[in-house]
Every structure is written in C-alpha cells, then in structure tokens.
Amino acid sequence: MNLKDFIRDIPDFPKPGIIFKDVTPMLKDPGAFKVCISSLKELVKDFEFNLIVAPEARGFIFAAPLALELEKGFVPIRKPGKLPYKTVSVEYSLEYGTATLEMHTDAIKEGDKVLIVDDVLATGGTMKAIAEMVEKVGGTISGIVSLVELSFLEPRKKLSGYEVRSIITY
C-alpha cells in the first residue's frame, strides 16, 4: 500500500502559496492508518527510548497509538494554558512571530530517552523547540520521526545533531 495515495494536497492553506499535506484521508481508512502506525513502528525499531512526545493536535493521532503498540509512555506537548498541572515551556520563532509549547514539569525525568513524533516535518522549528524543552528538563532525544517530511524546506538543517527519519518525503 502506498501511503502517499492517502495524503491530499490542499492549495493555499492555511495561507496563499502554501500547499498543505492533508493526512485526514489516511485516518478515515483503517487499513491505511494501520499501515502508517506499522511503518512508524518499523522506522523506530532500532531506537532506544522509554517515552514518546508529540505536539498537539495531529502529532497525538500518530504518537499515541505508536506508544501503545510499543508499550512506551506518551507525553502530550500542548499550547499554553491547556495542561492542568505545573508546566515547563519553550518559545520559538515562526515565519511571522513566535509560538509557545508546554509540557508538565514532571512528564520527563533526568535520564529519560525520548522519541519525538509528529505528522509533518516542515521547517523543523516545532521539533527543535520540543527537543530543547526535553533536554532542558534532563531528557535525551533518541530520535525524531514524522509521517511526512517536506525536504524542500530543509528541516534537517535545524535538526542537525539529531537522528531524523520520515516515512514519506516530498
């Protein structure tokens, strides 16, 4: 099964000139979604980690079933004000402005080995910010994986020093 067949292009979303890679057709098809999670599992089989972290919202869709399949813990990374307990945060630059991500202060402990998972790896900014936040609290990044990588945006430049893998590359 070719997973690219389940990803559609949405022109000019979220703004003119952007071609958005929409993974929702894959989610609607149980066979394709199963192949996606199995492919992610295969992609990370040689990484050593005890936790998977992912940013909201689409990162959760892929990371949570992967964590369950691999019997690893899952840590949600959220936008400010969405988590009920004490948080640690990181601010990072976007094309226009800045954004902030948070996680619970007790989610990652010194020595935890962490895998970062998201649906799309575009510029690498979100993944880099998550990696910095994990490292700030004593975790180690074992790897960074995504379903889709937009290689023409050169995300690996921002993520040099980390092992980065993707199932589909455009």
UniProtKB/Swiss-Prot annotation:
Subcellular location: Cytoplasm
Reactions catalysed: AMP + diphosphate = 5-phospho-alpha-D-ribose 1-diphosphate + adenine
Record-level GO BP terms: adenine salvage; AMP salvage; purine ribonucleoside salvage
CDD domains per record: PRTases_typeI
Pathway named in the protein's UniProt entry: Purine metabolism; AMP biosynthesis via salvage pathway; AMP from adenine: step 1/1
Record's keyword terms, sorted: Cytoplasm, Glycosyltransferase, Purine salvage, Transferase
GO function term, MF aspect, one: adenine binding
EC number(s) given by UniProt: 2.4.2.7
Predominant place of localization: cytoplasm
One Gene Ontology term, aspect cellular component: cytoplasm
Superkingdom as given in the UniProt entry: Bacteria
Enzyme category, top tier: transferase
InterPro entries: Ade_phspho_trans, PRibTrfase_dom, PRTase-like, UPRTase/APRTase
PROSITE patterns, sorted: PUR_PYR_PR_TRANSFER
Subunit: Homodimer.
Family: Belongs to the purine/pyrimidine phosphoribosyltransferase family.
Record's function text: Catalyzes a salvage reaction resulting in the formation of AMP, that is energically less costly than de novo synthesis.
Protein name as catalogued: Adenine phosphoribosyltransferase
Species of the source: Kosmotoga olearia (strain ATCC BAA-1733 / DSM 21960 / TBF 19.5.1)
